[in-house]
Amino acid sequence: MAASPADASRRRREKRRQLDARRSKCRIRLGGHMEQWCLLKEQLGFSLHSQLAKFLLDRYTSSGCVLCAGPEPVAPKGLQYLVLLSHAHSRECSLVPGLRGPGGQDGGLVWECSAGHTFSWGPSSGPKSPEEPNLTPLPSTDERSWCPEAKSGQEPAGLESNCDERAQEARMPRGAGPPPETFPSLGEDGEEEEEDEEEMLSDASPWTYSSSPDDEPDVPKPPPSPVTHALKDGEIAPAPAAVPAPLASPSSSASSLGSGAPGPVEVRIQPELRGTPQADQQTEPLASPGSQAQSALASAWDEDTAQIGPKRIRKAAKRELLPCDFPGCGRIFSNRQYLNHHKKYQHIHQKSFSCPEPACGKSFNFKKHLKEHVKLHSDTRDYICEFCARSFRTSSNLVIHRRIHTGEKPLQCEICGFTCRQKASLNWHRRKHAETVAALRFPCEFCGKRFEKPDSVAAHRSKSHPALLLAPQELSGPVESCSSILASASLGASEGSRSTLAPQAPILLP
């Protein structure tokens, strides 16, 4: 049994009410805050309002910052303590420690060098008291010596990086040498800071050595220069251009040794080179630091600049007229790239993107047009009006709808000046002009204006061109009375079909 029209209309109204209720839940009324909302969406880089709303919900519900997800930064004290431990290890061992892995106390990291010296460090760790050392002390010896690997001539992994750094410094531009090492000032404030640093190092350093009774009292000796360990057989020592001149003077070195501060670089290099057979060969380049250093930098700079070719001058693209060679297409392009793009998407792969809906069957030239079309088959409405919170499937529909609130009518008819908001309204209006022009078959011979009926033409003549109607009649025929002319004019205006005035007999008045 078929349902009655009343039941069908009732079900239709119920479905419409449910649809409106479901859509109203998705609307967000921003009121007067629409400008701030759009500005925030552009700053965060979201293309849809729903993405911004999802981001704000996630940020509100999350415990931490959404944008700053990741591990917490390490405290400066922890990093300073790590540098302190590494420096203390370098004073006693020339090998560079590497990360062995987690396993220290409180989940810290364990560092170990090739000689077996280990120490642990954690991000939250700091300097501890000497009673609780956190490092594995070195075995006590009667004489301070280097590790077996360094003695046997095996170069550790850390020294290879030093050689690479020196090679990179040799390739630097002329006059832009490596930055000199910064040494503490030798004034009273500098001496106090150095003494405090030595005390911290002695407290934090677990590597203690016991000297023999015949040796002199334990005086803090300066750490050996890495230059002496990086030298190999036949290798020339680098010029001490980075060592400041005041630090190379004997008076400054004597004052620094008396105050307990580490001595300058030259004081550390000379004693070790004195007993070797290569000392005489290596002290000669050290005596003249300016000539060889500048020549090495100059040669390296010339080699680098020679590899760089002349500046490339880019030529402008030629302007030419390239017509499309497909039959029936008269498009002309000024660039071959545009022509190839036109051929590919307008002729070769013409409408290769088809709609997946079986009942639709539409096809498009570009994939982006297909994506916009697929939205019409779904109920996805990502574009929301900022004035009334209505949602739309495409951005073009939102732009047209927004003109209702702004009052903008950018489209105008070129015939009568009619303005409208969307192209469909303008096309419908232009059809009226086309139909009207086809229906006006009777023109006026004086001004060219067209009318639908001949009666309208006669009325137009008598109203708009009365003088032009009288002039031909005076030149063509005999004398006529004024009353006959007026009578014929009124008769033509009333009947409409008679456009010419024939001569009539005079009317006799009683």
From Swiss-Prot:
Molecular function terms from GO: DNA-binding transcription factor activity; RNA polymerase II cis-regulatory region sequence-specific DNA binding; zinc ion binding
Compositional bias ranges of the Polar residues kind: 278-297
Keywords: DNA-binding, Metal-binding, Nucleus, Phosphoprotein, Repeat, Transcription, Transcription regulation, Zinc, Zinc-finger
Biased composition (Acidic residues): 188-201
Biased composition (Low complexity): 237-265
GO biological process, one term: regulation of transcription by RNA polymerase II
InterPro entries: ZnF_C2H2-type_TF, Znf_C2H2_sf, Znf_C2H2_type
One Pfam family of this chain: zf-C2H2
UniProt keyword Transcription regulation, yes or no: yes
Location of Phosphoserine modifications: S161, S225, S464
Region spans: Disordered: 1-20, 121-306
Compartmental location: Nucleus
Primary site of residence: nucleus
GO cellular component, one term: nucleus
Reported modifications of this chain: Phosphorylation at Ser-464 results in loss of DNA-binding activity.
Keyword Transcription regulation appears in the UniProt entry: yes
Cited function: May act as an transcriptional repressor for PCK1 gene expression, in turn may participate in the hepatic gluconeogenesis regulation through the activated AMPK signaling pathway.
Protein name, entry field: Zinc finger protein 692
Species for this entry: Bos taurus (Bovine)
UniProt lineage: Eukaryota, Metazoa, Chordata, Craniata, Vertebrata
Originating gene: ZNF692
